[in-house]
A protein has these predicted regions:
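ATP-binding N-lobe of GHMP and related small-molecule kinases
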Residues: 1-102, 114-124
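Short, conserved phosphate/pyrophosphate- and ester-handling motifs at nucleotide-, phospho-/glycolipid
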Residues: 105
Length: 134
């Protein structure tokens, strides 16, 4: 089992300019800082007999046997990227609820990528994690 803890962030200026469709057209800069609130991602390889290959717990609980059936796009694409083809459970626990503008989706992406690197026994730099999570 791997547990990551990723901080939330507050953007002081430039919020939204970090969105690819915006900065590709207009450019952009963001000034932000992390805060003392976190999103935790727990990744556990399932052992034994399970009914569903993928269990993803976020605001919803998903049970799927095919990656393409996972509704959470971050989880789906991370599992696809890391070629996870064995039973796995992904759970998130957050200090602050989603949709607050504090970067919960980004924190989830970073935490999940970090956890999946660890699960695959690959040491990754912070830069590598950030690039893949983007």
């Amino acid at each position: 089992m791997f547990i990551t803890r990723t901080p939330y962030r507050i953007s002081f200026v430039g919020g939204g300019t970090d969105i690819k469709s915006y900065y590709k057209k207009f450019g952009g800069k963001v000034i932000s800082a992390s805060i003392n609130k976190f999103l935790y991602v727990i990744v556990k390889k399932q052992i034994g007999f399970v009914k569903y290959k993928y269990r993803v717990n976020w605001s919803k609980i998903e049970f799927c046997n095919k990656i393409n059936d996972i509704k959470n796009p971050i989880a789906r694409e991370a599992l696809r990227y890391f070629k996870i083809d064995f039973p796995i459970e992904i759970t998130t626990i957050a200090d602050i609820p989603a949709n607050t503008g504090l970067g919960s989706s980004s924190a989830f992406a970073v935490g999940l990528v970090h956890a999946l690197f660890s699960l695959k026994n690959i040491r990754a730099t912070k830069h590598e994690i950030a690039i893949i999570a983007a």
